UniProtKB/Swiss-Prot annotation:
It catalyses: L-citrulline + L-aspartate + ATP = 2-(N(omega)-L-arginino)succinate + AMP + diphosphate + H(+). It is found in: Cytoplasm. It comes from the Bacteria. GO terms for biological process: argininosuccinate metabolic process; L-arginine biosynthetic process; urea cycle. The gene is argG. Pathway: Amino-acid biosynthesis; L-arginine biosynthesis; L-arginine from L-ornithine and carbamoyl phosphate: step 2/3. L-aspartate binds at residues 123, 127-128. It comes from Vibrio vulnificus (strain YJ016). ATP binds at residues 12-20, 39, 121. Its main location: cytoplasm. This is Argininosuccinate synthase. Its EC number is 6.3.4.5. One of its GO terms (cellular component) is cytoplasm. Keywords: Amino-acid biosynthesis, Arginine biosynthesis, ATP-binding, Cytoplasm, Ligase, Nucleotide-binding. It is an enzyme of class 6 (ligase).
Length: 403
């Protein structure tokens, strides 16, 4: 395949080995100017220390570090949370939700510097290549896209380190890297190493944020979440921005070992992969939101919201954020959440986040109607006629079968 004619490219840069190699590789193979773009999505301050200097030492002409933490939580995580989306019943979509906000900001930097191409460091086996390039296609169809992992012949960390050493480019990466990790404000994922065999139990070093539930405090801790229109607006009586609320709950949940999952998932590209995911704050938020929904949503609305969550989980996971269907689904979920207002107390103990108290001014739960004791507001004899009509189709089918 012939190479594209490129003048200036913006590369999504992390400071790791792969993207440190990509910058000089782009200059050598495309004879172009390279601008580095770093997305701060809450992966940790330690990951950003000296990153501009690293990028320029690798050959970038400029490096832009963009703070996307609040935007990620407010505009991507919260709308997804309202749908109740779990991918394949367990995964809270941590990596999936971060990719579109990163891609959007990368396109904005490309427009700012007058670039004619975009570059990502995703491998040809994973989901992220589809997520990034799908976003690029929706937001900047005129820009060219370069995916080095689908072009170059570097196949090992040793080769990548040698590549940098030959060019006197400094890199602190080690030859051995046991795990592949991805972190943002919502979660951290761990893949590879011992996890490549499904018969191996995760080692303790497969977990980064959360305490082993067995080693967590013996005394439970309680957190109180205030929910307005399906969003957490305050925790323990203090108003917080979406990002700050998540940081606070991450700290509380991690201390008690909340939010660990070990799953085998179906990747978009067809293969299965295994990962250990930690989402402490997100797990607490989801439990609290679900508790208020149980009070507020009627049966058919709750069922519909469940359907929205299932579809949303696949759209987000599959890299279809910038599509009319994703927007429509989340608009519907947002409408359903207008009355999802309430207060929830969550107990954190030994890996569990358990709702112990919940209330809402919009609650459809009525003690007078739900009581199992003496009943003054509900005439139980009315149920007979309802049941006869409700089961009419079954009755007719049975009568027909007897003919």
């Amino acid at each position: 395949m012939s190479k594209l004619n490129v003048n200036k490219v913006v590369v999504a840069y992390s400071g790791g080995l792969d993207t440190s190699v990509i910058i000089p590789w782009l200059k050598e193979n495309y004879d172009c100017e390279v601008v580095a773009f770093v997305a701060d999505v809450g992966q940790g301050e330690e990951e950003l220390v000296g990153i501009e200097e690293k990028a320029k030492a690798s050959g970038a002409s400029e490096c832009y570090v963009v703070d996307l933490k609040e935007e990620l939580v407010a505009d991507y995580i919260y709308p997804t949370l309202k749908t109740g989306a779990y991918y394949e019943g367990k995964y809270l979509l941590g990596t999936s939700m971060a990719r579109p906000v990163i891609a959007k900001a990368q396109v904005e930097i490309a427009r700012k510097v007058g670039a004619d191409a975009l570059c990502h460091g995703c491998t040809g086996k994973g989901n992220d290549q589809v997520r990034f390039e799908g976003a690029f296609a929706a937001l900047a169809p005129d820009l060219k896209v370069i995916a080095p992992w689908r072009e170059w012949d570097l196949v090992s960390r040793e080769q990548c380190l040698d590549y940098l050493a030959e060019r006197n480019i400094p890199c602190a990466a080690s030859l051995t890297k046991i795990y592949s990790r991805d972190a943002n404000a919502w979660h951290i994922s761990t893949e590879g190493g011992v996890l490549e065999s499904t018969w191996n139990a995760p080692n303790e070093d497969c977990w980064v944020w959360t305490v082993d539930p067995e080693q967590a405090p013996n005394e439970a801790e309680y957190v109180t979440l205030q929910v307005e229109k399906g969003e957490v607006v305050a925790v323990d009586g203090e108003q917080m921005t979406p990002y700050n609320a998540l940081v606070y709950l991450n700290e509380k949940g991690a201390k008690h070992g909340v939010g660990r999952i070990d799953i085998v998932e179906n990747r978009l590209v067809g293969m299965k992969s295994r990962g250990c995911y930690e989402t402490p704050g997100g797990t607490i938020m989801m439990e609290a939101l679900r508790a208020v929904e149980q009070l507020v949503l009627d049966k058919t609305s709750f069922e519909f919201r469940e359907e929205l969550g299932l579809k949303a989980s696949h759209l987000v996971y599959d890299g279809r954020w910038f599509t009319p269907l994703r927007k429509s689904i989340m608009a519907a979920a947002d409408e359903l959440a207008q009355d999802v207002n309430g207060e929830v107390v969550v107990k954190l103990y030994k890996g569990m986040a358990t709702v112990t108290q919940k209330r809402s001014e919009n609650s459809l739960y009525s003690e007078a109607f739900a009581t199992f004791g003496e009943d003054e507001v509900y005439d139980q004899s009315h149920a007979g006629g309802f049941i006869r009509l409700y089961s009419l189709s079954s009755r007719i089918r049975a009568l027909n079968s007897q003919k």
